């Protein structure tokens, strides 16, 4: 039971009590109030300060910090995660146990979660609060929630020095005047879905200049660049602080961003970067709030070619109905630099972005929450995309998040399905594995020429689900020159047949059929095509008139 120290003497009770009875009774109430308050203070008075816990996870070393302040029987402060800071907005006590209500940012929204803890000697045992991911997304930054389900032991101490920005007081944040809505002129880029590599899925915020240069080398030497992957995108974690003029500087892990861009360009590649329209990024680094023009000019001067712009803390400042105007601010700023920079929105499919994404100058927009490296996450995201198809067109693409191919959470068969589905969807092909250490099988998936050709087809139509029979789904994408890409997906665990009648494609003759993964022409009947599909696998064919 959670203790409350608020005691009220009922006036009617006072009137009914004899005078000689009331005084001892009132004294007893006052004593109980004092004892309860002292009891709470005894349990909480020693936990003010900084508490640190560290553990190892599949994402790397994880450090969580609590900055706590106890006053008048309440705990206030901040929970600091690798994904950013979150304020403690309420607390409860029960003996040596306590609960902290944390206000978290999750995929562009705010939500409250509970961190439960107890005092154990000179330590605190706390099960930290993490944002609940969208269904199928897996967890913070693509990490399984189960990873964080147990308590951690916190000791008093100093956190590891970080480049993250200080916590923001959102109540005193300067207000920004949003512009009247208008159409930002198309930048002429991304005539086909962008292809590249992004640091987040594999490295999260643990990135350096050296890592990016090594990835650039790998993209150039492995065949990735020659297969069409041209954008090397530095995700969250590169930012330092702003100088006296307000110009955002990279942190010490990136001593010279212009030199890094020059190096990436020398490899025949283009460099991308990451920011947020909010005061802080998802990782707690400096965002572009109120500094859109200056940041755009800075990136252009560095030689940046791609911007991923993540909603994150913007949800604490604006409503979804204001999202279009917020993104338009950066669209205008990028356009004003005169440099061609791909503009990729990351707003998790919210606010009917398909209706207005192109008008703010965006070349792509996210349609979902974050993906994680699992069949459940990938399939729940990928197979939910059919309704987005009408919004895709040359220069403007639906983005169901980055590829997890090669990160180890799925089988080679499942990664082949993942890659095929993204190709059919006309989604950006942004790899996220460690390109320095790729198996031949993973390399074969990511560089499969005929599958990439489906993704990059110049007609620019996104695929849609044609039929579903049990575990087997048939997806079709219209291609240039009257051809079709047809994918037979088996979402079940055991082999199952997939079939297609040519009349469903308005074909009245026997067309030419090619298996794109097997790289062979295959026979077909005059009526249609039937194939057995192994569990969690796919058969992808090109149907030509």
Segment roles from a protein language model:
Residues 524-545:
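C-terminal beta-strand-rich structural cap/linker in extracellular carbohydrate-active enzymes
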Residues 294, 325, 339-434, 455:
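Glycan-recognition surfaces
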């Amino acid at each position: 039971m959670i203790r409350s120290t608020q005691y009220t003497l009922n006036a009617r009770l006072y009137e009914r009590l004899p005078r000689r009875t009331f005084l001892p009774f009132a004294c007893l109430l006052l004593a109980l109030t004092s004892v309860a308050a002292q009891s709470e203070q005894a349990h909480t008075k020693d936990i003010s300060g900084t508490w640190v816990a560290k553990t190892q996870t599949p994402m790397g070393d994880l450090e969580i910090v609590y900055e706590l302040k106890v006053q008048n029987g309440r705990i206030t402060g901040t929970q600091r995660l690798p994904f950013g800071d979150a304020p403690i907005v309420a607390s409860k006590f029960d003996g040596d146990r306590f609960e902290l209500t944390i206000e978290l940012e999750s995929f562009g929204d705010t939500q409250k979660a509970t961190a439960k803890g107890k005092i154990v000697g000179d330590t605190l045992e706390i099960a930290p609060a993490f944002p609940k991911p969208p269904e199928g997304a897996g967890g913070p930054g693509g990490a399984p929630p189960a990873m964080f389900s147990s308590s951690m032991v916190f000791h008093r101490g100093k956190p590891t020095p970080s480049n993250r920005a200080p916590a923001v007081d959102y109540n005193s944040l300067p207000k920004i005047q949003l512009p009247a809505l208008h159409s930002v002129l198309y930048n002429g880029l991304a005539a086909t879905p962008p292809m590249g590599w992004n640091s987040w899925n594999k490295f999260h915020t643990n990135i350096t200049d050296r890592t990016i240069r090594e990835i650039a080398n790998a993209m150039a030497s492995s065949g990735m660049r020659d297969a069409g992957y041209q954008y090397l995108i530095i995700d969250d974690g590169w930012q330092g602080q702003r100088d006296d003029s307000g110009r955002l500087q990279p942190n010490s892990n990136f001593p010279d961003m212009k030199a890094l861009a020059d190096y990436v360009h020398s490899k025949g590649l283009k460099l991308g970067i990451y920011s947020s329209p909010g005061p802080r990024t998802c990782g707690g680094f400096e965002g572009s709030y109120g500094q859109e023009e200056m940041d755009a000019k800075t990136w252009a001067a560095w030689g940046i070619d791609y911007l991923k712009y993540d909603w994150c803390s913007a949800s604490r400042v604006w409503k979804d109905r204001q999202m279009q105007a917020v993104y338009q601010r950066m669209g205008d700023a990028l356009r004003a630099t005169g440099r061609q920079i791909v503009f990729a929105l990351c707003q998790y499919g919210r606010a009917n972005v398909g209706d207005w994404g192109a008008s703010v100058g965006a070349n792509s927009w996210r349609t979902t929450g974050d993906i994680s490296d699992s069949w459940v996450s990938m399939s729940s995201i990928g197979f939910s995309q059919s309704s987005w198809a009408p919004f895709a067109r040359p220069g403007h693409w639906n983005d169901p998040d980055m590829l997890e191919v090669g990160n180890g959470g799925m089988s080679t068969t499942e990664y082949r399905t993942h890659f095929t589905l993204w190709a059919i969807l006309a989604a950006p092909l942004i790899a996220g594995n460690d390109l320095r250490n790729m198996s031949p099988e993973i390399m074969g998936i990511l560089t499969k020429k005929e599958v990439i050709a489906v993704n990059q087809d110049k007609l620019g139509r996104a695929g849609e689900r044609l039929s579903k029979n049990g575990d087997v789904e048939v997806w079709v994408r219209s291609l240039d020159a009257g051809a079709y890409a047809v994918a037979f997906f088996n979402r079940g665990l055991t082999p199952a047949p997939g079939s297609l009648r040519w009349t469903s494609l308005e074909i009245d003759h026997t067309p030419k059929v090619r298996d794109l993964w097997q790289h062979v022409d295959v026979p077909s009947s005059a009526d249609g095509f039937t194939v057995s599909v192994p569990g969690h696998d796919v058969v992808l064919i090109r149907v030509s008139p």
